[in-house]
């Protein structure tokens, strides 16, 4: 009888001990897969994103500094030539440079930069809204820094219009997250080298992003994204493109031949399906 009582007591004791031990040991949270966004802020990921961003920004600055800002410096000035804040919105040569197609280029480039920042921040555990907002702010800051550097360049100048275009592009992903209509709209870029006019002039094989004569920017619309319940194929969109032709002469004001054809050139428009 004592043996039976002892066995029952042991089973009860082990059961109680196991229950108490399970209650005191916290559950181990499954590790988030590397390529999956963290649910909460992951300090290690956040630090890695910051370190990678700083390295990328430094590398980009080093490249652009040699490509764009290697000339002798001037005092700070706006694109219109003046240095007073009241002259910030004066139209300079920037107003006719590349038939203003570069404004779309600033928008598109900033949108890509902002999206990269936002994806990294989201991966580290921030919410979607926080990530897109921070992406917009950081993208705008990068655009502002570029324009400030341009403000000291003898070739360029701080362009308020370039900065505004870049800022809109930086916040476009955030605006898309808030608008059903904007989710169906996107900006895309294509490059096809159909002539060498630009490269024949600059005498080097670089800076293709400034070769607007061979560049096309597309505004795409996908009806399925606007109304998922529609029968419109989700892989098919409609695109309207814009570019400039090879008559776009004298990219820079100091080009041989003077300024008589500065700002000339014709637009090219395209209509095409957008197959995703």
What are these regions (language model features)?
Residues 191-195, 242-248:
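Transmembrane beta-strands of outer-membrane beta-barrel pores
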Residues 106-113, 150-177:
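Alpha-helical transmembrane segments that form the membrane-embedded catalytic/substrate-binding core
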Residues 13-103, 107-114, 118, 122-126, ...:
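N-terminal targeting leaders of membrane proteins
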Residues 56-57, 131-151, 167-170:
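Small-polar-interrupted transmembrane alpha-helices in polytopic inner-membrane proteins
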């Amino acid at each position: 009888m004592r043996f039976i009582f002892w066995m029952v007591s042991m089973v009860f004791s082990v059961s109680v001990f196991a229950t108490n031990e399970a209650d005191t040991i916290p559950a181990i949270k499954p590790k988030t897969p590397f390529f999956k966004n963290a649910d909460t802020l992951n300090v290690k990921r956040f630090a890695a994103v910051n370190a990678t961003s700083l390295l990328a920004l430094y590398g980009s600055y080093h490249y652009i500094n040699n490509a764009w800002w290697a000339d002798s410096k001037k005092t700070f000035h706006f694109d219109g030539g003046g240095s007073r804040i009241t002259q910030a919105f004066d139209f300079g040569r920037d107003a006719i440079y590349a038939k203003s197609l570069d404004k779309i280029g600033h928008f598109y480039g900033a949108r890509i930069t902002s999206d990269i920042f936002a994806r990294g921040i989201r991966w580290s555990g921030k919410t979607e809204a926080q990530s897109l907002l921070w992406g917009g702010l950081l993208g705008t800051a990068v655009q502002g820094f570029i324009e400030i550097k341009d403000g000291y360049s003898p070739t360029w100048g701080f362009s308020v219009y370039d900065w505004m275009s870049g800022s809109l592009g930086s916040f476009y992903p955030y605006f898309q997250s808030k608008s059903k209509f904007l989710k169906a709209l996107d900006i895309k870029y294509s490059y096809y080298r159909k002539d060498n006019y630009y490269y024949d002039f600059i005498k080097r094989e670089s800076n293709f992003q400034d070769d607007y004569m061979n560049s096309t920017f597309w505004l795409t619309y996908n009806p399925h994204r606007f109304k998922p319940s529609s029968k419109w194929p989700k892989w098919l969109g409609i695109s309207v493109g814009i570019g400039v032709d090879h008559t776009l002469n004298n990219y820079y004001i100091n080009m041989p031949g003077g300024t008589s054809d500065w700002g000339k050139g014709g637009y090219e428009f395209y209509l095409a399906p957008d197959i995703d």
